[in-house]
Amino acid sequence: DLFQVIKEKLKELTGGVIEGIQGV
């Protein structure tokens, strides 16, 4: 399912962003 893949990529992206904010 394409939507599922997009959702997973988005989750991965936001997860990295949150990690970056917490790292600072």
Curated annotation (Swiss-Prot):
Statement: the UniProt record of this protein carries the keyword Secreted? yes
Any one Gene Ontology cellular component term annotated for this protein: extracellular region
Expressed in which tissues: Expressed by the dorsal and submental skin glands.
Positions in coiled-coil regions: none
UniProt keyword list: Amphibian defense peptide, Secreted
Q: Where in the cell is it found?
A: Secreted
Principal cellular location given in the protein's record: secreted
GO BP annotations of the record are: defense response
Question: Is the Cytoplasm keyword given for this protein?
Answer: no
What is this protein called in UniProt? Answer: Citropin-3.1.2
**Native species:** Ranoidea citropa (Australian Blue Mountains tree frog)
